[in-house]
């Protein structure tokens, strides 16, 4: 079993796992012609892969002791499906932040929304996947930690929780770092942390009835002027379609194949 952890024995641990709904990483991604944002309807929507590792790590922690796991996601109405999918792995409840004004929000706005949704809920540990497959910026966990004034422990491939203290190992080019912190704290995990479980049929059915809050910006005390494409500090100004691949040259060997190959290599200036 990869990854390891220990629980705070005898203490209820409240864990929040932030997940993102993204286009399937194997599908061709497209940008919207109107505002140059990612066209999320152009491919199947799935739970961000690394976020599944975050959910798994949270579940392993509470299974070694006591606690509850809440899934938090920000996104359009369809993102509720990804919250339910994460709950079906074994989490207890979900929070979905959905508002039309969120369209086009950048990492700064995303971190603001997530932090406001987390505030005041008494979470001991907030876990993220280290990056999302649609943006790959790897900055939202650190931004959320900064907004909440909490320690951040990023890119963890091993998580240990014991006696109210958190220890993570982070692989580096020269070995690994061992970082310690008190709780509450924010952690982001990489794919080497564990192996995400498949939801059982029982948990899939239970996820349909699990409590889930659907909140607007107003519900978490934010104004639309703080989020969205118009207020984003990072935007795509222009883009171009990838050039189509040219058809390859087919050489038929009629007894002089070697000469044809040599001639082709000469014309391409390879020799």
PLM features per residue range, with description:
Residues 2-271:
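N-terminal glycine-rich FAD/FM-binding segment characteristic of electron-transfer flavoproteins
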């Amino acid at each position: 079993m990869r990854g390891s952890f220990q629980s705070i024995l005898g203490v209820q641990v409240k864990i929040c796992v932030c997940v993102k709904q993204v286009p399937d990483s194997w599908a061709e991604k497209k940008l919207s012609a109107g505002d140059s944002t990612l066209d999320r309807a152009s491919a199947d929507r799935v739970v961000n892969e690394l976020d599944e590792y975050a959910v798994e790590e949270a579940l392993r922690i509470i299974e070694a002791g006591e606690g509850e796991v809440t899934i938090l996601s920000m996104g359009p109405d369809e993102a509720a499906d990804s919250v339910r999918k994460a709950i079906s792995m074994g989490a207890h409840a979900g929070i979905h932040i959905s508002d039309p004004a969120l369209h086009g929000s950048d990492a700064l706005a995303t971190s603001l929304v997530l932090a406001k949704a987390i505030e005041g809920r008494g979470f001991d540990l907030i876990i993220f996947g280290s990056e999302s497959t649609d943006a790959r910026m790897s900055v939202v966990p650190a931004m959320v930690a900064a907004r909440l004034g909490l320690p951040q422990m990023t890119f963890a491939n091993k998580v240990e929780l014991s006696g109210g203290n958190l220890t993570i190992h982070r692989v580096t080019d020269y070995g690994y770092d061992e970082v310690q912190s008190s709780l509450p704290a924010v952690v982001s995990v990489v794919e080497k942390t564990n192996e995400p479980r498949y939801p059982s049929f029982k948990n899939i059915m239970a996820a349909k009835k699990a409590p889930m809050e659907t909140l607007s910006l107003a519900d978490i005390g934010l104004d639309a002027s703080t989020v969205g494409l118009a207020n984003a500090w990072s935007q795509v100004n222009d883009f171009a379609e990838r050039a189509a691949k040219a058809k390859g040259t087919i050489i038929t060997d009629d007894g002089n194949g070697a000469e044809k190959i040599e001639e082709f290599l000469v014309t391409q200036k390879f020799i």
